[in-house]
């Protein structure tokens, strides 16, 4: 059999040469053979201290259990190495045996496959010795090129002249085992002090803390309540810094969160105190409004008294026959009214500015102010017309006197003979205009009655009063301007007094406004009748 192209080749190792050789079948192929059998042994570890001068033993027990005992050198300290395993029968595997002396190549069948592993325990059973004739085929089978693995060894043999070199690893294994167990014990010893609470005061904790990072999380997980020595020091410093900052007012970085929390909490306290002050101010404003309602009933009475005084003075002037005295009285009253008008405008504007600064919660629009001022002016005009429109001789004479005084003050060329005709014309014109104004006021009051629920507390600005009065002045004819000049001044005085009173408080309640409008509507209905 030629085998080429191998490093090293079988022919080179066995010195077979290039010639062709015959292959013979061995005794195992004879069915009558009962003495010859070939087995293979596969082991996991080969000791270096095997004594090749002595024979090894193979013991086949029950349940296919096999025990192989290999002797060791005396200097190794271990008498022999023991292998244990099981065996299986071969079905188609064969073994080639080459004889170097004769050059004969023989083919034999394999009987059993034995696989063993090294054990630490030593066997005391007596081994059964293999025949000497089987040693040669076992060695050749181990070194042959057949399907048998190269790691097989023969149990015993003397014909080949060389025994298998088995290494003893008992001492090496034991030393490795000791090292491995020692390292495990060291790890356990290192791990236990980590979990023990007595290690908090031990000086070896920094060394333990420099272990692998895999063991550090386990230490934290097992010691959730325990902390490193540096962590309590940091928390103690934080507490000390926080207390010192709270007592001494120091701005450390550790108390930034608490300082920001306190600073953010101050606006809430300020806003709550501000709201409390506003709530306290509301009852005070309500009390002021009640006082103003009491004072509000006085302007019509004051206005009536003022008109009665004027009528008495004018009648006194007519009875005495001194028109100069009446003109002087009228001029003095006009000057006083102008002075009062200026003072009330200043007071109303000052109170309105104060109200706009002190009451930022006023949400009324200028349209509301227009409605309020118009309703107040209408109520005042209706009251004045009721007083001036009574069917009495004194009122008619007072109106004629006032018209005479007005016409006398405007033009000095008029005489006493022309006065009755002028008075009739002026009275008829004033009556028609008053009737027309009453109809307009009644329509406006009906329109404003729907808007009364929407009216709130609002300030009455003098600018709106002056605008409304200017509109009334433009609506009047030029020939009647001199006659109603005195009445308009009285209306302005009353409206400014009321607006000054209301502006000082910042507004007036809705129920008072409704009462005035109802009173004015009743008076307008009486006049229409």
Curated annotation (Swiss-Prot):
<dbReference type="GO" id="GO:0034605">
    <property type="term" value="P:cellular response to heat"/>
</dbReference>
<keyword id="KW-0217">Developmental protein</keyword>
<feature type="compositionally biased region" description="Polar residues">
    <location>
        <begin position="167"/>
        <end position="186"/>
    </location>
</feature>
<feature type="compositionally biased region" description="Low complexity">
    <location>
        <begin position="431"/>
        <end position="451"/>
    </location>
</feature>
<keyword id="KW-0597">Phosphoprotein</keyword>
<feature type="region of interest" description="Disordered">
    <location>
        <begin position="155"/>
        <end position="235"/>
    </location>
</feature>
<dbReference type="GO" id="GO:0006368">
    <property type="term" value="P:transcription elongation by RNA polymerase II"/>
</dbReference>
<keyword id="KW-0804">Transcription</keyword>
<feature type="region of interest" description="Disordered">
    <location>
        <begin position="253"/>
        <end position="529"/>
    </location>
</feature>
<feature type="compositionally biased region" description="Low complexity">
    <location>
        <begin position="510"/>
        <end position="523"/>
    </location>
</feature>
<feature type="compositionally biased region" description="Low complexity">
    <location>
        <begin position="194"/>
        <end position="215"/>
    </location>
</feature>
<comment type="similarity">
    <text>Belongs to the EAF family.</text>
</comment>
<feature type="compositionally biased region" description="Acidic residues">
    <location>
        <begin position="401"/>
        <end position="416"/>
    </location>
</feature>
<feature type="compositionally biased region" description="Low complexity">
    <location>
        <begin position="256"/>
        <end position="265"/>
    </location>
</feature>
<feature type="compositionally biased region" description="Low complexity">
    <location>
        <begin position="469"/>
        <end position="480"/>
    </location>
</feature>
<keyword id="KW-0539">Nucleus</keyword>
<dbReference type="InterPro" id="IPR027093">
    <property type="entry name" value="EAF_fam"/>
</dbReference>
<feature type="compositionally biased region" description="Low complexity">
    <location>
        <begin position="327"/>
        <end position="346"/>
    </location>
</feature>
<feature type="compositionally biased region" description="Polar residues">
    <location>
        <begin position="347"/>
        <end position="359"/>
    </location>
</feature>
<keyword id="KW-0010">Activator</keyword>
<dbReference type="InterPro" id="IPR019194">
    <property type="entry name" value="Tscrpt_elong_fac_Eaf_N"/>
</dbReference>
<feature type="modified residue" description="Phosphoserine">
    <location>
        <position position="196"/>
    </location>
</feature>
<feature type="compositionally biased region" description="Low complexity">
    <location>
        <begin position="488"/>
        <end position="499"/>
    </location>
</feature>
<dbReference type="GO" id="GO:0045893">
    <property type="term" value="P:positive regulation of DNA-templated transcription"/>
</dbReference>
<keyword id="KW-0805">Transcription regulation</keyword>
<feature type="compositionally biased region" description="Low complexity">
    <location>
        <begin position="306"/>
        <end position="315"/>
    </location>
</feature>
<dbReference type="GO" id="GO:0032783">
    <property type="term" value="C:super elongation complex"/>
</dbReference>
<dbReference type="Pfam" id="PF09816">
    <property type="entry name" value="EAF"/>
</dbReference>
<dbReference type="GO" id="GO:0003711">
    <property type="term" value="F:transcription elongation factor activity"/>
</dbReference>
<protein>
    <recommendedName>
        <fullName>Ell-associated factor Eaf</fullName>
    </recommendedName>
</protein>
<dbReference type="GO" id="GO:0005654">
    <property type="term" value="C:nucleoplasm"/>
</dbReference>
<comment type="function">
    <text>Promotes transcriptional elongation by Su(Tpl)/ELL. Essential for development.</text>
</comment>
